[in-house]
Amino acid sequence: MKRRTVLRAGAGVLAGGAALTLSHSPLAAAAATAVPAAPAADPTDGWTRTSFTYSWQKPWNLDLSDRHSYSGGVHRMWVYSTDEPFEEGNSTDPRTEMRWKNDYTTGDHMWDADVYLPAGTDGASFVQTLRTRRPSGTPATDIMLNAYNTGGGTVRRYDGTVLKTNAYDTWFNVKIAHEASSGTGTIKVYFDDSLVLTVDDRGPATRYFKNGVYHHGSGRAEARFRNIAYWTR
């Protein structure tokens, strides 16, 4: 992916629910209030928490401590638009990212973490699924979630579908569940355990998760992560 380039993708399917209509009679109201609503299913039900490993990608000419800190269970990662890429001579945008080393081709895989996006982070990807081995001419990513400096902090799929507003300066949980197959698989995105997006992936590939800041904008970008987990089934 070239510098200052973000792949676009079509709109996804947003989760929704049917409206519930109740009778206004006292008997019907009593019956309705007597039965509690069933709790929403946890997206990790039926999944197994699995260990994972990762390596770091950061500006090639800097120490990791110049762009990352870890304290109290929280990873802080930041980068500047003027920083060097992760490899000398590389043409991609600057980043400070965890590159997960649990590559996969098929099967069900879920990335899970609490995310905090400080105000002002604009144009940075904070989590993505990178297609490292893929058919020629196919996209480099299956999905990317980006932060933009609008609406109190807007999270978009690439630079298109709006998934969340008022995302700045607050913790929220993100889960990306990928049902990968030898053909076209399915990706589901959850915020605070509510489904916000369902889309197809980009077809067969070997891929891996990444999280941090991959900066396509200007100035400084930062993201924080805690309770990072990997699930399979």
Question: What does each model-found stretch correspond to?
Answer:
Residues 7-26:
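N-terminal export signals
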Residues 35-61:
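N-terminal module-boundary/linker segments of secreted carbohydrate-active enzymes
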Residues 42, 108, 201-233:
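Ligand-recognition surfaces built from glycine- and aromatic
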Residues 53-79:
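Extracellular glycan-recognition surfaces and repeat-rich motifs
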Residues 76-150:
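Secretory/extracellular carbohydrate-interaction modules
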Residues 154-173:
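Short, aromatic/His-centered strand-loop micro-motif at the edge of beta-sheets
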Residues 170-180, 187-189:
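Short tryptophan-centered beta-strand motifs in secreted/extracellular beta-sheet-rich domains
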Residues 190-194:
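Short strand-turn-strand beta-turns centered on an Asx-Gly dipeptide
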